[in-house]
Amino acid sequence: VSVPPTSYRDRIMNALEESMIDVDAIRGSSARELVEIGKVALLNQPMDEGRIMSWLSDRFPDTQKPKGPIYSKTTIYHGTNKQKRKQRYALVQSLYKKDISAAARVVLDENDKIATKIPPVRHMFDYWKDVFATGGGSAATNINRAPPAPHMETLWDPVSLIEIKSARASNEKGAGPDGVTPRSWNALDDRYKRLLYNIFVFYGRVPSPIKGSRTVFTPKIEGGPDPGVFRPLSICSVILREFNKILARRFVSCYTYDERQTAYLPIDGVCINVSMLTAIIAEAKRLRKELHIAILDLVKAFNSVYHSALIDAITEAGCPPGVVDYIADMYNNVITEMQFEGKCELASILAGVYQGDPLSGPLFTLAYEKALRALNNEGRFDIADVRVNASAYSDDGLLLAMTVIGLQHNLDKFGETLAKIGLRINSRKSKTVSLVPSGREKKMKIVSNRRLLLKASELKPLTISDLWKYLGVVYTTSGPEVAKVSMDDDLSKLTKGPLKPQQRIHLLKTFVIPKHLNRLVLSRTTATGLCKMDLLIRKYVRRWLRLPGDVPVAFLYAPVKAGGKGIPCLKQWIPLMRFLRLNKAKRTGGDRIAAVLNCQLYASISHSCKTGPVSVGLWRSTNTGGLSAYWRRILIGMVDGKDLKSAQNHSSATSFNSIRMNDISGEDYIHYNQLRTNSIPTRKRTARGRPNKPTACRAGCDKLKRLQHDIQGCIRSQGGLVQRHDRVVDLLFDECETKGYAAEKVVHLRTSEELWKPDLVLKKNGRVVVVDAQVVQCGRLESDHRVKVSKYRDDPELADVIREKYAVQEVTFEACTLSYKGIWSKNSVEGLQKLGISNYCLFKIVTSVLRGSWLNWVRFNNVTTVVHW
């Protein structure tokens, strides 16, 4: 191990001492033990791996070794069809609380019913052992020492608390071979982590047990008897993953990658590469310039790159010796535990990077850069004064040239350089496209007789009828194909799946639509196609919520905080996202990308994206916030949506839409949405467009039978009003008692003129707060709140009676005011929050009011009382 410079050594020693002081302040045997391990480093003694692992075992005593997924078995349901449906419902609901992604896979992929075809376990292990054992020499030998580049010196600095907080892994991720879960590791005090990581930085390595991994295999497609269709995923210890994530972020910020490589960078690399390819094809056709493209596929790239090539790459990049030594140690004598179908076997890894480790991507692309730098500029395509000869996103590469000879020369160079670092082009899956101008017809034609060779193998030339895919976008030989996306199958599975209605909407927004979003944004789309998808989505959502067809469309598209469902309107959302992503690509992709994306094609695309939303009245909005504001304005401007105008006063009014509030039944969720949208079939509503239909109240009231009258004003619903009101008071009473108030319900306070009966009297710290609850109509929330507060506050004698009875000087009055649709008065909710009422209590009040309002409507229809005037 190389000796670091004195200045660097002083920095790490100072950081170790500071970390030890912070940990020592925690106190306890665990803190003292880790401080002692740090003192060993300060004394320049070798790393005591056993002591570090013993400390970790004491901190995480209940770890269980993961076993990996099992594909050959399906979930077995027993009994009648009804019992099987109940069992599947129980499974999905249980998964939904633990891992929403797993629940989504059960519903959308039906992996609980269909077993994946797999090869025999022995065949699987033997195949991947051979793949892992094919390497290009040890990572720790023949390291070419070089002085670090000045801009890379901070790469091996001591770890800070801020970096640790920002690098935390998701709690839902899997544990490594040590069994330490991300949830338990995230619960550990960051001061412990800082000292431990700085010990790693000081020694330039991690303990050998930590750098091990377990490898699970996931099918790339539906599976099959061939082990090659499975993708190995190496899961390291969460301790190593978090440390490597910090290093990866430092590396990306310090090193300037070749601008032709766009993966693992803080830019939209997929959009940049797809947009560049589309622009190049369009410019070649517009200017009738010859264009030849090679679409290259590599054979198991991440499993084949030589470890020695990784070390050479980081050394040439000017990384500090500490980083070079750390990477060399991490990839030296690597052992992984292969896990498949409940069986385990150890294997040595002599090539490849850890797939799943945050540092693997930056390391791989750094080695891949060597092949990009070997390309000759003579084989290139000129667009907007920019010479483009290649484009890459991780291992997905393209070579471009204006002549076949130039492309063939670069293809040879590229293949030779890749072979030196352990990578090989798959000639069977790689393709070529040749566009040649036809002078007589003034058009571009596809030529399939221009042969390109990779060593002795010929790359497949595409014809005019062939389709090919690049980064998820389907291309024809003339550019991106019009996106053919069908959501009908996924929506049908959501409908039939054992889900609550709110879960269906959540999966629609977080899984089904995002599944197709990238392709819709980056491919060509038509307004008709997007409208058809919007119609299909609306049809299913109305079915899930049992909403009539005349419910405002804005209710589905308005944001959740405004009282809507927050479902994106694809006709507007897709052009807007395309415009935003193109602009971001121009800003972050560098001058070369910006020049290419300023061509005529993208000028027209940007113009059409901006004018599309303008045509529906978005005030020339070019952000998602403007789109949300537009739909909110439409919603509250309609008869069935105007009552939601104040929904934004507090999040508890709409938080029943949140998937975290999983205790709401599906039936109640449907009723709440029917209330919010006036979708309950009252006489007044069903008479829309039927002028001769009677609309008077069936109870004989001299009123129109509106929803508001049925729930709030009819004689049939008076008993329900009292029960709903009492439920609100009970919730407030229980909450105030937990907050330390001495609470009393329905206190009788007599003045000279009147007997007052406030719902709650709260006493705490020499102060009394009088709270009265009311559930009112939707249109006058703030004025009704002021009237209620003024009713108590404007009687000076009442305050004196309270002071005398409770022996306090300070008396204040508050009102709990919300509408029968569960919408809060802004002043009311602010006053309740000042009393310490929690958001959860406010949410429970909202759902209690909504449920009470629904039961009031049910009561109205069940009661037969008639008033005779």
From Swiss-Prot:
Originating organism: Bradysia coprophila (Dark-winged fungus gnat)
Signal sequence annotation: none
Protein name as catalogued: Retrovirus-related Pol polyprotein from type-1 retrotransposable element R2
Protein keywords: Endonuclease, Hydrolase, Nuclease, Nucleotidyltransferase, RNA-directed DNA polymerase, Transferase, Transposable element
Sequence segments annotated as region (Nucleic acid-binding endonuclease): 601-869
EC number, as in UniProt: 2.7.7.49
InterPro entries for this protein: DNA/RNA_pol_sf (IPR043502), RT_dom (IPR000477)
Reaction catalysed by this enzyme: DNA(n) + a 2'-deoxyribonucleoside 5'-triphosphate = DNA(n+1) + diphosphate
Pfam families per the UniProt record, alphabetical: RVT_1
GO molecular function per UniProt: endonuclease activity; RNA-directed DNA polymerase activity
Domain Reverse transcriptase: 199-475
Coiled-coil parts of chain: none
